[in-house]
Amino acid sequence: WQGLHGATALVEGTWGATIHDQVAPQAGEIVVTKRGVSAFHASDLDQILHTSRIGTLLLAGVATNFVVEGTARQACDLGYDTIVVGDCCASVSQEAHDASLTVALPFLCTISNLEEVTAALK
């Protein structure tokens, strides 16, 4: 986050941090405010997951080699079975995205795609 300190694009309560209507939570769904590279950092995500008895995580998002990988690393440390849905992630470059999916993440979690995950959830 060092390069983002002082940035105004992702400030809670501003347009840049607003959840888009197409993915907005439904009534009663939990929203966790992300405060660091990993979704677990300085949040109650781990407690929420444990309380809900959730042991498997599906990760997708922007910045494969940064945010997704950071969250996967901490999820691994916390003992979660983690699946990264690779074709539902993006990064600043295809090279960075591919490197994360082929070099670092396979040591931490399972790499899958949307088609496989959707079929497994049916």
Feature names for model-found ranges:
Residues 1-122:
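Active-site-adjacent betaalpha module
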